[in-house]
Amino acid sequence: MVKTYLFLAGAVFFEVAGTMLLPVTQNFTKLIPTAALAFFYLCAFYLLTFVVDKIPIAIMYATWSGLGIFTIAILGYIFFKQTLAWQAILGLFLIVIGVVLVNSYTGKLS
């Protein structure tokens, strides 16, 4: 199961890397950032194919998207100087709590 979660973490990493490139692509007019974005998304989905066999798809997707949202919000704050209101910060922590709760019951759902 550890290997499965490593694949899931890798998928989150590649999805976040691709999403962080979105502003750099300038509406997909810049070839190299656009190609890198596509490559990162392909890697993310490739890794997810190994995860979906071990974790129910709803839990896999909730974890992938939840951790991606949390990470992108933090990186957007750091690299793009985007502000986060206290409500957004609270919401992000609730997402993390939800991901932890959902994954703590993964074995019982399989």
Q: At which residue positions do the language-model features occur?
A:
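Polytopic alpha-helical membrane proteins, predominantly small-molecule transporters/carriers
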Residues: 1-110
